Amino acid sequence: MTIDTTEVDALINAPGRCVVNSSLESLVELISHLSSCGFEQLTDIFGIDYLEREKRIEVVYLLLDLKRNRRCCVKVSVDPASEKVPTCCGVFSVANWFEREVYDMYGVVFEGHPDLRRILTDYEFEGFPMLKDFPLTGYKEVRYDLESKEVVYEKVDLSQDYRSFDSLTPWKGVGRPSDPFDGRKE
């Protein structure tokens, strides 16, 4: 198996730990290769919203090699409005649930997923609640109406259109959260 090194950037930041930045095109091949190299357990897939980036969502895959006590973090950046992430369900079946959660919270579409639908929020939920520009109150209020004996959805009056995340503070680390899997120094 040959992985195009122009599409993968790796960093070993501690003994037994590595971070790999991948392109969308190489992702499934890379995950499959790592699986055949002993990383037999996919422990999590999650998203991080970097509002200021062009490709604002970073999808992170955490792989574990129990025999050699190694961990590998694979990252791929995506613009959920225009790009789809290839599913890894063919390599790790547990990816099914993790990918559904990332879709539900961040709106990232996983191409080829066998059952991509919401898993944590209501099926009529609008938007993706973990995005930094999602309103704190949501778009609709859901409540049970005793008179009609049914669930009622009511539009919420948004008093705050947009939250600004720029912070002029002297405190270290407030402007940019630290990422234990990031090899860059502050």
From Swiss-Prot:
SUPFAM superfamilies documented for this protein: Nqo5-like
Name listed for the protein in its UniProt record: NADH-quinone oxidoreductase subunit C
Positions of region (Disordered): 166-186
Family matches, as PROSITE patterns: COMPLEX1_30K
InterPro entries: NADH_DH_suC, NADH_quin_OxRdtase_su_C/D-like, NADH_UbQ_OxRdtase_30kDa_su, NADH_UbQ_OxRdtase_CS
Catalyzed reactions: a quinone + NADH + 5 H(+)(in) = a quinol + NAD(+) + 4 H(+)(out)
A Pfam family this chain is assigned to: Complex1_30kDa
Function: NDH-1 shuttles electrons from NADH, via FMN and iron-sulfur (Fe-S) centers, to quinones in the respiratory chain. The immediate electron acceptor for the enzyme in this species is believed to be ubiquinone. Couples the redox reaction to proton translocation (for every two electrons transferred, four hydrogen ions are translocated across the cytoplasmic membrane), and thus conserves the redox energy in a proton gradient.
Keyword Ribosomal protein: no
Signal peptide start and end residues: none
Enzyme class: translocase
GO molecular function: NADH dehydrogenase (ubiquinone) activity; NADH:ubiquinone reductase (non-electrogenic) activity; quinone binding
Stretches that traverse the bilayer: none
Location of this chain's protein in the cell: Cell inner membrane
Keywords (A to Z) from UniProt: Cell inner membrane, Cell membrane, Membrane, NAD, Quinone, Translocase, Transport, Ubiquinone
Record-listed E.C. numbers: 7.1.1.-
Gene Ontology, cellular component aspect: plasma membrane
Family of this protein: Belongs to the complex I 30 kDa subunit family.
Membrane topology: Peripheral membrane protein
Quaternary structure, from the entry: NDH-1 is composed of 14 different subunits. Subunits NuoB, C, D, E, F, and G constitute the peripheral sector of the complex.
Principal cellular location given in the protein's record: membrane
